[in-house]
Amino acid sequence: MALAYDGAIQRLIDAFANLPGIGPKGAQRIAFYLLNAPDEESQALIDAITEVKEKVRFCDICGNVCETSPCPVCADPRRDHSVICVVEEPKDVMSIERTREYRGMYHVLGGVINPMANVQPSDLNIAKLIERLKDSEVKEVILALNPNVEGEATTSFLSQLLSQTDIKVTRLASGLPVGGDIEYADEITLGRALAGRRAV
């Protein structure tokens, strides 16, 4: 049987290991780093986590993260309110914003359709998207979901759903590798994918 640390240190390692992208060894490294870090540094991390949990919420309009709703994008009158870019997660909004190529609005689904993980369309922020589309100002919806199986399934579902409207539905152009994530795409590739989007 593998040796485990006692009490608090093992609970801390386990907590870090539960985070996405952090395995057992990485979790152990972080835990021991914090154990040896100055108290101020550890307290700064604790305060940052507490502050995020207390202050950060989801925008009532688009579903992006914010401290006040509506979020800065939805509240900005200089943005193009006739275009909505649909993304999977808030981190995808930041990736697209870094391109400086897009000045429209966003809609965050909060995930993708994934029958293996029991995620159905009703579990996503789709009903609010349909409500937003009743606004006659919206002329185009860009489906900017990751080019993997789940993203493609969600794109297909939304395409069929939106085909019943007069709204132009487009998706990102090729350039993003199949199975890749928008989050990891460089700004140039993502900018070109936005500029070259095509009808669905």
Task: Put a short name on every predicted segment.
Residues 27, 76-142:
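Extended interfacial segments that mediate partner engagement and assembly in macromolecular machines
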Residues 2-9, 18, 31-93:
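Cys/His-rich Zn2+-binding cysteine-cluster or related metal-binding knuckle/ribbon modules and their
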Residues 10-14, 28-32, 43, 47, ...:
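Solvent-exposed alpha-helical segments within well-ordered globular domains of core cellular machineries
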Residues 15, 19, 37, 52-55, ...:
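Conserved, well-folded catalytic cores of nucleic-acid-processing
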